[in-house]
Amino acid sequence: MKRIYLLLSLLTGCLYMQAAIYNVRDFGAKADGKAIDSPAINRAIEAAAQEGGGTVYLPAGEYACYSIRLKSNIHLYLEQGARIIAAFPEKDKGYDMAEPNEHNKYQ
């Protein structure tokens, strides 16, 4: 009886430990290759990070992006046909500056 109770407890715990999936379209990504999707992707990453981790899911499409800021325990899953493309920087928008590094000036 104790073994059955232990087994049920472990199975229940495993179900609750499954990481959530965060679809970037739910956070505003357009995936049309024109709209800048990095803010939506970063919002999905932030939401997953606040819950302790998870999978950020990118359905098929073209995601024009500036900097994407990954965090611990976050997995990016690109569906077949999904591409992240570099967006052309604008005058007042664009990529994060390179962070200082003791080995060279690039990240």
Question: Model-derived features: where do they sit?
Answer:
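Extracellular/periplasmic carbohydrate-active domains that bind, remodel
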Residues: 17-107
